């Protein structure tokens, strides 16, 4: 979804992504940086781990980490904003 069509929550989520995720994940490609690229993450049938990309699974991985990905400290609002942004990719 083009940035011009984002709502306020998605725009806040993009800011959370820049602060917490961008150093390890590209947003507009599936090519890996330190972690997998996030393009179409919520639209694929399985994440690189093989698990489905449900909001619940994305929340668990974000908050608790997995493999090389560390746990991330986010407020509930930041997490919801980030999920809204991930759905735009």
For each feature predicted by the language model, list its residue ranges.
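Axial heme c-ligation environment in periplasmic c-type cytochrome domains
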Residues: 33-41, 61-89
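Electrostatic cytochrome c docking/interface patches
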Residues: 1-16
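Pocket-edge positions in alpha/beta enzyme catalytic cores
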Residues: 5, 50, 71-74
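Gly/Gly-Pro-rich "capping" loops immediately C-terminal to redox-active cysteine motifs
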Residues: 10-14, 26-60
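The canonical Cys-X-X-Cys-His
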Residues: 13, 17-28, 82-86
């Amino acid at each position: 979804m083009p940035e011009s069509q984002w709502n306020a929550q998605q725009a806040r989520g993009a800011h959370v992504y820049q602060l917490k995720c961008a150093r390890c994940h590209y947003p507009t490609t599936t090519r890996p940086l330190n972690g997998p690229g996030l393009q179409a993450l919520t639209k694929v049938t399985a994440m690189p781990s093989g698990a489905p990309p449900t909001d619940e699974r994305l929340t668990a991985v974000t908050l608790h980490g997995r493999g090389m990905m560390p746990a991330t400290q986010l407020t509930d609002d930041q997490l919801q904003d980030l999920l809204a942004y991930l759905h735009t990719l």
